[in-house]
Swiss-Prot record:
Ranges for region RNA-binding: 266-284
Residue pairs linked by disulfide bridges in the UniProt entry: none
GO MF annotation: an example: ATP binding
Natural source organism: Salmonella arizonae (strain ATCC BAA-731 / CDC346-86 / RSK2980)
Protein name (database record): RNase adapter protein RapZ
Binding locations of ATP: 8-15
Family per record: Belongs to the RapZ-like family. RapZ subfamily.
InterPro entries in alphabetical order: P-loop_NTPase, RapZ-like, RapZ-like_N, RapZ_C
Length: 284
C-alpha cells in the first residue's frame, strides 16, 4: 500500500491533487499533523487502503528529525512517497489575485510576495526529498488531475517510470526535469515552409530529421548515456526519472527526439511516459 504525502507551495494545486487521489481510491486527509501519520497508517493497514495526506506550512514539523521519525515508524505494509507541487512565483501571485484568498503566511507586515518566498524556505526540506516534483504553472485543474492519474495508475510497483517531455526554451525550462538536453543545434524543420505548420509527431517532419546523421548521433549518444546510469537510478529508490528535451519552440525537434527516446526505452521493457508541453498548451 502507498502512503502519498502531498506537499508544495500554497496555490500550487495540493487540494486538486488530493481530490484526484481520492477519486483513485486513496483515503485522503488534509493537514494531518506529521506525528499522527504512523497512527493513521496502522488504522488503515488492516483495511488494505492506500492513504494520501497533505502537508504544508500549517502542519510542518518543527524539525526534519520529527518527519524522519514519523516515516521510520510507519507499518511495513506502507510504502511512503512524497509528491511536491510547485509553480513559478508570478503564477502563484496571479492565482492568489484571482481567488482573493489569503496566503497562510500573510500578515500586516508581510506582503504576498514575501510570504511566498518565506514559504519556499520553510518547505525546502520536503522539496529536497520529494520522489516527484510537478510544475503546475501551465496546468489547468483538469490537466493536473489527469497527469496524476496517468502517472500513479500507470506506474508498476517498485519500477522506475521514465518520463520524456519536450519543451520550448522560449517558454522556460521545466522545473520538474531531472535531465535537460538542448537540441537547438540540430537542423530545424521550421525553416521549411511546408513543414513549419506540422509537429514532430508528423511523418514529413520525422522524415526530414531522419535524413540527418547528427540527429541519429544525438539520439544514440543520449540513450547510451541514460542506459549507462539507469541501473543506478533504478536502485536509488526513486519512482520517476524525467528527461526534458528542448528546442526553440518545442514543436518539431524536441518532440521528435522525445518520441524516439520514449519508443526506444519502451521497446526495452521500461515503464515509459511521454509528454509534449508546447503541443499540450496549444490544445487549450
Amino acid at each position: 500500500m502507498v502512503l502519498m504525502i502531498v506537499s508544495g507551495r500554497s496555490g500550487s494545486g495540493k487540494s486538486v491533487a488530493l481530490r484526484a487521489l481520492e477519486d483513485m481510491g486513496f483515503y485522503c486527509v488534509d493537514n494531518l499533523p506529521v506525528v499522527l501519520l504512523p497512527d493513521l497508517a496502522r488504522t488503515l493497514a488492516d483495511r488494505q487502503i492506500s492513504a494520501a495526506v497533505s502537508i504544508d506550512v500549517r502542519n510542518m514539523p518543527e524539525s526534519p528529525e520529527i518527519f524522519e521519525q514519523a516515516m521510520n515508524n510507519l507499518p511495513d505494509a506502507f510504502s511512503p512517497q512524497l509528491l511536491f507541487l510547485d509553480a513559478d512565483r508570478n503564477t502563484l501571485i496571479r492565482r492568489y489575485s484571482d481567488t482573493r484568498r489569503l496566503h497562510p503566511l500573510s500578515s500586516k507586515n508581510l506582503s504576498l510576495e514575501s510570504a511566498i518566498d518565506k514559504e519556499s524556505d520553510l518547505l525546502e526540506p520536503l522539496r529536497s526529498r520529494a520522489d516527484l516534483i510537478v510544475d503546475t504553472s501551465e496546468m489547468s485543474v483538469h490537466e493536473l488531475a489527469e497527469m496524476l492519474r496517468t502517472r500513479l495508475l500507470g506506474k508498476r510497483e517498485r519500477e522506475l517510470t521514465m518520463v520524456f517531455e519536450s519543451f520550448g526554451f522560449k517558454h522556460g525550462i521545466p522545473i520538474d526535469a531531472d535531465y535537460v538536453f538542448d537540441v537547438r543545434f540540430l537542423p530545424n524543420p521550421h525553416w521549411d515552409p511546408k513543414l513549419r505548420p506540422m509537429t514532430g509527431l508528423d511523418k514529413p517532419v520525422a522524415a526530414f530529421l531522419d535524413r540527418h546523421t547528427e540527429v541519429h548521433n544525438f539520439i544514440y549518444q543520449t540513450r547510451s548515456y541514460l542506459e549507462l546510469w539507469l541501473p543506478m537510478l533504478e536502485t536509488n529508490n526513486r519512482s520517476y526519472l524525467t528527461v526534458a528535451i528542448g528546442c526553440t519552440g518545442g514543436k518539431h525537434r524536441s518532440v521528435y527526439i522525445a518520441e524516439q527516446l520514449a519508443d526506444y526505452f519502451r521497446s526495452r521493457g521500461k515503464n515509459v511516459q511521454s509528454r509534449h508541453r508546447t503541443l499540450e498548451k496549444r490544445k487549450t
